[in-house]
Amino acid sequence: MNILKLTPSCKDYLWGGSRLRSDFGIKSDLNPLAEAWVLSCHPDGPSYLADGTTLADYVTAHPGCLGTDCEKFEQFPILTKFIDAKNNLSIQVHPSNEYALKNEHQYGKTEMWYVLDCEPGAFLYYGFDHEISKAEFEERIKNNTLTEVLNAVPVHKGDCFFIPAGTLHAICKGIVIAEVQQNSNVTYRVYDYGRVGADGKPRALHVEKALDVTLRTPPVKHDFGSHLAQGCLLYTSPSPRDSTSSR
């Protein structure tokens, strides 16, 4: 099989910067250049072959190109993108497969981040710093105090984070990330710093759905690998099944 060179679909979300173009060679006239979907069969941002064929159409026409391990999936299973966060992304959550298939007619979204680069002092939000009730979660969204109870995690170049569906999170300013995720584009935004979109209106929030799917038990921090130069740090979120009773 020949190697296929893909052209990404790019996004100009308002929090983006220019480093994907200047530092990573992504060709796009968009400004800002927030994301490049470099391996994607999703209709919201497909990757393209040199002849203009989408990767999704190519995979459909050549079902054996992915080998036998992917045959059990109904669609191309992953989406890979580069993200340049010049400013904070919204605080958001992605639903599980079960919830998304029922309510959005597509799969949910679990994702993984690899930090390609970051500014000194950069951090991201990952879950809550203590368990909170659904009522408190909703109230803090309403009064703009949600960040007071979030887990702020310092990041460094080379760090890797696993973000299970249901984990409230946000990539914050000064971070460039490579993301591998499920082939989904379902995001429930709960806080956006009062920003407005290109139409001059506040960007939509999705509070009710976020209340349904967010895990409100804090992630567990694991330190290990002390014999390594920088050690290892792992955060794990409780499973949705374990947290159902406390939502």
Task: Label the model's feature ranges.
Residues 94-95, 118, 164-166, 180:
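Fold-independent oxyanion-binding glycine-rich loops
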Residues 1-132, 192-231:
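Transition-metal
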Residues 118-156, 162:
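Intrinsically disordered, low-complexity linker/loop segments enriched in Gly/Pro
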Residues 235-242:
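Conserved small/polar residues in nucleotide/adenosyl-binding loops
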Residues 155-173:
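Conserved metal-binding segment of the jelly-roll/cupin
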Residues 112, 170-193:
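A short hydrophobic beta-strand segment most commonly corresponding to one strand
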